[in-house]
Amino acid sequence: MSKSGNGNGDKVLYCSFCGKSQHEVKKLIAGPSVFVCDECVELCNDIIREETHETHEETEARLPTPKEISNFLDEYVIGQQHAKKVLSVAVYNHYKRLQHKSEDGVELGKSNILLIGPTGSGKTLLAQTLARILNVPFAMADATTLTEAGYVGEDVENIIQKLLQKCDYDVDKAQQGIVYIDEIDKISRKSDNPSITRDVSGEGVQQALLKLIEGTVASVPPQGGRKHPQQEFLQVDTSNILFICGGAFAGLDKVIRERSDKSSIGFSAQLKSKKSSNDEVSKVLGQLESDDLIKYGLIPEFVGRLPVVTTLQELDEAALIDILTRPKNALTKQFQSLFKMEGSELEFRGEALIAIAKKALERKMGARGLRSILENILLDTMYDLPSLEGVNKVVIDESVVNGLSKPILIYEQDEKKSASGSKD
């Protein structure tokens, strides 16, 4: 017992760990026959934090193999097997390069990635999922909002600021993060010839991104403050940040065809229909060369900074149905969880899923259009359900998806009647 008396007869309490008296510390916490002071509590917290951090670092040290990365992507992203393989290898090599600095003097270059695919094919989701499996900070940027320094819009350094925000301004963590720049095709040069006038949202942005993607020390104001001369900047080295750029590149297949048609002019040339199917477009994109991207409007230096290029196919009806049901966080599972919170089961019939997929194909939004379709279908039900009592199940069939009828509500009493009827 850490107690003792003083001359006045009052008992002085002492910390059972460090021996300091109650007068030497701010707070003394009493337990059964022991006392602990606030200083010892703080010290214990520090020890626990350090051990947790060390354990976390040990866990992070193991880099998953390309197969493991691809298998993890399969849990969240449907299809796009070739793109997954390319990404898995590129990301594995990138982080292996960071973990094992070359001892034989061979300097390993950084392999940034370019994803080409239609809207809603899974470009953003692939990049997000990669960051999740590797447990690294992830930031997204829209290339259309970027401008050259000094013009109205976002500076390219703002991308690094977003990355810092994701890891509480831990510079070391940010320097090993992943940055995804979407709509990269929208900053293509407006013509083949270098622009005489300023192109602040096209070629100018490509020039500004060059150094950032290749590797430079970016100066970022701390905690999102505005830039001013007296302020100390955070210095972030972008050499080890993996940049993934994505875009739809509409019309790129025509650029590739023009190039290939030049080599097959004459009697041996095959006549091609004006309209191309999705499979034909995918085959054409498979013949992509760096010169095609330059012809499209990316400057040669920018194309050179993105050595790993892979294409994603447009999702068909079967793939969209799989996206609705198969992934861990599939949309139907998300809405079923919402309805479960209200005590109701949500059921999607097979023909309803087909109708939803067909609607998404009509809108040409790919997987991105699925959520808005489901939101519209379930809006009235989600509005009414919290006010209704005894709704056991909500059923969605094809007619509901096509707007011909309302969702079927099955009440608790109806289920009891049908159950008793079957017994009789």
Swiss-Prot record:
PROSITE patterns: CLPX_ZB (PS51902). ATP binds at residues 118-125. Coiled coil: none annotated. Residues 1-56 form the ClpX-type ZB domain. The keyword Chaperone applies. One of its GO terms (cellular component) is HslUV protease complex. Keywords: ATP-binding, Chaperone, Metal-binding, Nucleotide-binding, Zinc. Belongs to the ClpX chaperone family. ATP-dependent specificity component of the Clp protease. It directs the protease to specific substrates. Can perform chaperone functions in the absence of ClpP. Component of the ClpX-ClpP complex. Forms a hexameric ring that, in the presence of ATP, binds to fourteen ClpP subunits assembled into a disk-like structure with a central cavity, resembling the structure of eukaryotic proteasomes. This is ATP-dependent Clp protease ATP-binding subunit ClpX. It comes from Legionella pneumophila subsp. pneumophila (strain Philadelphia 1 / ATCC 33152 / DSM 7513). The gene is clpX.
